[in-house]
A protein has these predicted regions:
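Flexible, glycine/charged-enriched surface loops at secondary-structure junctions
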Residues: 57-65, 166-169, 232-239, 269-280, ...
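C-terminal binding/interaction regions
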Residues: 119, 123-124, 137-167, 172-174, ...
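Conserved helix-loop functional segments at active or binding sites
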Residues: 53, 229, 266-270, 355, ...
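Glycine- and Gly-Pro-enriched alpha-helical subdomains that act as flexible
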Residues: 72-114, 244-343
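Gly-rich Lys/Arg/Thr-decorated short loops/hinges at beta-loop-alpha junctions or inter-strand turns
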Residues: 23-35, 111-117, 191-210, 287-309, ...
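Bateman/CBS regulatory modules and CBS-like beta-alpha motifs in cytosolic regions of diverse proteins
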Residues: 126, 205-215, 344
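Active-site-proximal loop/turn and secondary-structure-junction residues that shape catalytic pockets
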Residues: 70, 127, 239-240, 344, ...
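Active-site loops and adjacent core secondary-structure elements that bind or stabilize anionic groups
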Residues: 1-201, 216-234
Length: 394
């Protein structure tokens, strides 16, 4: 297949639309089901690069959940705790611990379930049956992987009345060294961002505390590779083999740090005993439960515990999660990693990161206020590496 005609471009009025190879060669993909759209393919090709690089960097199966050309999370295949399984709605999945790919999917899809509603999924490895069973029951636009087990493919083909978008990519495909795009009829050309992110990038530790364990280095690598494919400005919190908060597309660095931090806090609080034991009505679907949990934790527009409201969601009226309970639970967090796609211009980013349990940081350095940022890290006993690598993505 040398080109694929799309229903439309970014918006329904943008026609005609298609994808094709500039040199007239075959596309490196097969479409096994559905008819992916313009934004679907933007998500697919960005997300595939992310998981491919994670697998190469860490040697573990990797999965990411994408929405509007940015990841909601990315994760590698590490088994989940019982509480995390419950928080991710996968505690009923048989054989989960036996499939590293399924563990990576459970983590990535379960991190920011509100934002992953209608996501695009990328997998570094051949999709197995366990992973397909989990993906089948989530609201998703499509998936890209280097292959699919026959039974897994048949499971996925039943989604969306047989119209679920399933793309298979050639894992050996390597794009040209130069990439191009047009804006307002003007062609932009640049070299692809081929810089390899690995442990060596974290060798310049500028803080007094220089103890960077392997687990922290892994999480920093996950954060940085995630940022490489996130719309800038961006900041990413990561822990235990997964990104837990992505702050994407903000014009201010501190707003990135706050947004990602609030997402990380929500992820932690989903594992609070009160949240895990909310008495949901049996007829309440998974997306509705996600909305209610978010409201319960963050006290959004609707008080889900109030008289006249709780009856819509719960069998019995739950006690609210108080500010004191949230503060106490969040105070137990530790060893969180944080990556930034550009330098921190002020130490307020460090102050906010500390509130979400951050101990390890990787950022390029180069600010005129680097000394103030380093001093703030030292006050909290943090470990910070200057990686010297800006990771803007547009």
């Amino acid at each position: 297949m040398k080109e694929f005609e799309l229903k439309y471009g970014c918006n329904p009025n943008q026609k005609p639309a298609k994808i094709y190879m500039n040199d007239g060669s075959e596309l490196p993909i097969q479409i096994l089901s559905g008819r992916p759209g313009y934004i679907n393919f933007l998500d697919a090709f960005n997300s595939w690069q992310l998981v491919k690089e994670l697998k190469e960097a860490l040697g573990l199966p990797a999965v990411t959940s994408f929405k509007h050309v940015s990841p909601t999370s990315a994760a590698v295949g590490i088994p989940l705790s019982d509480d995390l399984k419950k928080a991710c709605f996968v505690d009923d999945i048989e054989g989960l611990d036996d499939s590293p790919l399924a563990c990576a999917y459970a983590r990535a899809r379960g991190t920011d379930r509100m934002c992953s509603f209608g996501d695009w999924v990328a997998m570094s490895d051949v999709c197995d049956v366990t992973t397909a069973k989990m993906l089948k029951r989530e609201v998703s636009d499509g998936v890209i992987a280097p292959g699919y087990e026959p039974e897994a493919l048949e499971i996925l083909k039943t989604k969306r009345k047989g119209n679920y978008n399933i793309v298979q990519i050639d894992p050996d495909y390597v794009p040209e060294a130069q990439e191009r795009k047009q804006v307002f009829g003007i062609t932009f050309e640049q070299g692809r961002n081929n810089f390899e992110i690995n442990r060596a990038l974290l060798s310049e530790i500028v803080t007094k505390n220089k103890d960077l364990p392997d687990s922290a280095a892994r999480d920093l690598i996950i954060a940085l590779i995630t940022l490489k494919y996130t719309q800038s400005n961006s900041v990413c919190y990561a822990v235990d083999g997964q990104a837990i908060g992505v702050g994407a597309g903000q014009q201010s660095r501190i707003h990135c740090t706050r947004l990602a931090g609030s997402k990380a806090d929500t992820w932690f609080l989903r594992q609070h005993e009160k949240v895990l034991n909310l008495p949901f009505r049996a007829d309440l679907g998974r997306p509705e439960r996600d909305n209610v949990i978010d409201g319960y934790i963050n006290q959004n527009e609707e008080d889900v515990c109030a008289d006249g409201n709780w009856q819509k969601y719960f069998e019995t009226q739950p006690a609210p999660l108080t500010d004191a309970e949230k503060k106490a639970f969040l105070s137990t967090r530790q060893n969180v990693a944080l990556g930034s796609d550009a330098f921190f211009p002020f130490s307020d980013n460090i102050e906010r990161a500390y509130r979400s349990g951050v101990k390890y940081i990787a950022e390029p350095g180069g600010s005129i206020r680097d000394d103030a940022v380093i001093d703030c890290c030292n006050r909290y006993g943090m470990v910070m590496a200057f990686d010297g690598l800006r990771l803007f993505h547009h």
